[in-house]
Structures are given as C-alpha cells and as structure tokens.
Amino acid sequence: MQALYDVPAPAKLNLFLHVTGRRPDGYHLLQSVFMLIDWCDVLHFEVGGNGAVTREDLTSALPADDLVVRAARALQKATGCPQGVHIGVSKHIPAQAGLGGGSSDAASTLLALNRLWKLKLSRQQLHSIALTLGADVPFFLCGASAWVEGIGDIIRPLELEHQLPPAAFAVVKPEAGLDTRMIFSHPSLKRDSSCATISGFAATHYQFGSNDLQPVAQALCPEITQAINWLESKGLQGRMTGSGSAVFAQITHAVDLHDAPAAWHVKVCENLKSHPLADWVFG
C-alpha cells in the first residue's frame, strides 16, 4: 500500500465544559464530554521514500508547520521510520472554533501513517505521541465520544449505558475567532465548578451542565452572543463548544437556518457512534 485517499478527520462538540480547578503549574483541570460529529476534514496520503514530509493545501491555506506536519514528523522521530509522505489537506472544519479540527487532522495523520508505514503501533503507543502534539489530539484516537477529565489527558470512552442517543445539531461558527490563551488567562474565568459524574450527565445528556468558558468568551467576542441569540430566535438552546467561537444547539423541531449572516459557517451535523477510523488501530 502506497497511498490512502479520502481519510476523514471528524470534528467534536463539547457537550459541557466545567473548569474544576487549577494546578500549581498553571494548567486548568477540566471535565467535559467530547462528542464526535460528522463535520470532517479530508486528508490524502502518498508515501515517499526520501523521508520528506510535505503538505498541499487543497482548500484554505494552513500554517507551514501545522499539526498535520508535526504529527507526521513526531511519528517518524518516535519510530525511526525512514519513509516520507506527501499529505493533501481538504479543510472544511473552521479554525479558532472549538471544534478540534487541527487536533483531529493530527490524529487521523497518526492513524493513517501507522497503517501506510506498516508501523503496527498500538493505540496506547500512538496516544503517547499524540500527547506531545496537543491536549485534544489523544481524544481523537480513542475511537468514540468520551468523558474527559484532568488537563484533557484522562479519557474514558462512554460505556454502553452512558452512550449518546442519535441527534442532530445546528453548529454555527461566527466570522470572528478566539485565542484559547486569552480565555484561560482571564481573571474572571470561573475555576471552581463542582465535580460532575458520568451518571449525572447520562440522566440528561444534551441538557447537562454548561460551558464555564462561555461568559469570558462572550465578553471578548460579541459575535458569540449574536450567534446564540440567532439560535434562540429559532427556538434552539445554544451553547459554546470548547473555547469557541463556534456554538451549537440540538435540533428538536423543523427549523430554517438559511438566514444566517453570510460570513458565518452554519452546518447541520449528526453525532457519530464511533470514529470512522476506530478499527485502524488495536489496543
């Protein structure tokens, strides 16, 4: 096998996000449920023999040293693999949205190259590499929606009794984006939410909890409030995902979403029962 085409990298929604504390080293302690949705970037991989890692942007331009390139090079370094790869990236998930697009691209890159380069690394071995790339990357290797704690490093796929029922969501990305660091460094960020339980979450699923980052994000980015108000005008209860600026709402009735501002990304998504590449790795 010398190539893999049309490799999906799905986005995620944070159904809730509580900040429960802060470590002495400054990292925040979180609780969240990360849910996979069917809004995907698409990646293409062609093996090269000279060890070079190159990337082609098939849609919007990406930074020269983005997470896709970093993931490929981290895998080379960890394994001593002499092979290279040319990666084509068709970007559909908006950046600075809280949807995890860059992290998902990195995870799909690890999974695809583990197969193409015949490395046979286990999920846990890939997880160790993913940790060096960013807090959200390991989640996209776990294969399913998950309960996430700690600094994002404690990941538990939802057990059968806690799994999410199928649902559709309106996801709205305003034109403006947000720098995550500005939110976590803000003095008014709530950092003392009570610890939640998986059973408590499972009792209400999509109505559970809140996003502790949202008040600060709304103060920094008024478009988030505008997007939530727009969803509410449709009879939908919006909340922010991750550190924004995207917001989402479960669709519970027929709704027309065609009158959004032209600069916004609006997409109706469904949740995924499992990651489309879940069976590409063992362990």
Swiss-Prot record:
Its EC number is 2.7.1.148. Pathway: Isoprenoid biosynthesis; isopentenyl diphosphate biosynthesis via DXP pathway; isopentenyl diphosphate from 1-deoxy-D-xylulose 5-phosphate: step 3/6. It comes from the Bacteria. GO terms for biological process: isopentenyl diphosphate biosynthetic process, methylerythritol 4-phosphate pathway; terpenoid biosynthetic process. InterPro entries: GHMP_kinase_C_dom (IPR013750), GHMP_kinase_C_sf (IPR036554), GHMP_kinase_N_dom (IPR006204), IspE (IPR004424), Ribosomal_Su5_D2-typ_SF (IPR020568), Ribsml_uS5_D2-typ_fold_subgr (IPR014721). HAMAP family: IspE (MF_00061). This is 4-diphosphocytidyl-2-C-methyl-D-erythritol kinase.
